[in-house]
């Protein structure tokens, strides 16, 4: 949830410039390289959209929120997700008492689905991850949590945008997870997640790449998940300060994992990166 931190960095635009080092040890996920991540329109996350007429990578950022949605109070967009040609952007609001998912169908048509918050539910809507069968939508809240939320996939399993998108069930990790910025399925029973955890007490490492092995495919009832920390994501910049790990994407076509990491201070503009990994 980097909107305030990013806005402050853009306003101040001052930092101490020093050489940076990429300290990443993410187990079998080996760095293949990186691409510049623009601060305004590539700072929240990304999704690989695969369609018969062509495939593309779609990013989200603070400048990609449609004006009409911003006017309705949807003031933050998270890490998007995609599967079977459907593309989903997650939105949150400080005042609407709801979350919104903006969905583009394979034919290019857009719809908006609103979920009214449950009494126990946080307002955060950090990411959207679609199950491999296209039937379920997974999202996450901010802070330390013992759940990921699952909804019927809007546009596929739930097709009435004018009705409340219902909460369906949860993924229940066997270990608390903190500040999850993005998740994506690598199979029907495995998620990879990017965590912006700056404390490090949960897994002994800050800013980790997490692996969640599910007890079974999503099928309409709670599933448990074994959580493993695979190591710290790369933190490389010419500036000192606090990095922000953002969203992620797994491209099932070639096994490429991409994770956005925004740089500290002024360098948020100059050397933020989308890191590319492959499993060795």
Residue ranges and their predicted role:
Residues 1-24:
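Secretory targeting and sorting signals
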Residues 32-62, 71-81:
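Beta-strand-rich domains and repeat architectures in extracellular enzymes and scaffolds
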Residues 34-41, 68-73, 115-122, 170-176, ...:
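Surface loop/turn motifs at the tips and blade-to-blade linkers of beta-strand repeat domains
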Residues 40-45, 74-80, 125, 177-183, ...:
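Signature of short aromatic-glycine-proline-rich micro-motifs recurring in repeat-based ectodomains
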Residues 55-56, 66, 95-103, 144-153, ...:
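Structural motif
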Residues 62-99, 110-119:
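Blade-loop segments of beta-propeller domains
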Residues 175-227:
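Loop/turn-rich, solvent-exposed surfaces of beta-rich toroidal or solenoidal domains
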Residues 221-252:
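Conserved blade-ending motifs and adjacent loop-strand segments that build the rim/top face
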């Amino acid at each position: 949830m980097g909107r305030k931190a990013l806005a402050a960095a853009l306003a101040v635009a001052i930092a101490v410039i020093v050489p940076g080092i990429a300290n990443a040890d993410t187990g079998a996920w080996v760095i293949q390289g990186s691409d510049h991540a623009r601060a305004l329109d590539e700072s929240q996350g990304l999704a690989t959209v695969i369609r018969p007429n062509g495939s593309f990578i779609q990013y989200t950022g603070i400048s990609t929120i449609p004006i009409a949605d911003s006017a309705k109070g949807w003031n933050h967009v998270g890490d998007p997700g995609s599967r079977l040609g459907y593309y989903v952007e997650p939105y949150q609001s400080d005042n609407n008492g709801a979350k919104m998912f903006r969905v583009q169908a394979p034919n290019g048509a857009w719809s908006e689905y609103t979920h009214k918050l449950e009494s126990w539910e946080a307002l955060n809507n950090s990411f959207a991850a679609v199950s491999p069968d296209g039937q379920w939508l997974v999202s996450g809240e901010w802070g330390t949590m013992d759940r990921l939320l699952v909804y019927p996939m809007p546009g596929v399993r739930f097709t009435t945008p004018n009705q409340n998108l219902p909460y369906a069930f949860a993924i229940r990790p066997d270990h608390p997870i903190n500040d999850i910025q993005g998740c994506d399925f690598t199979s029907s029973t495995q998620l990879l997640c990017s965590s912006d955890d700056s404390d490090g007490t949960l897994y002994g490492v800050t800013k980790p790449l997490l692996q969640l092995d599910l007890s079974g495919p999503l099928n309409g009832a709670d599933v448990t998940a074994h959580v493993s920390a695979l190591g710290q994501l790369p933190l490389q910049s010419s500036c000192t300060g606090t990095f922000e790990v953002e969203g992620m994407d797994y491209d099932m076509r070639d096994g490429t994992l991409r994770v956005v990491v925004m740089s500290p201070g002024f360098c948020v503009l100059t050397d933020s990166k989308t890191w590319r990994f492959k499993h060795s």
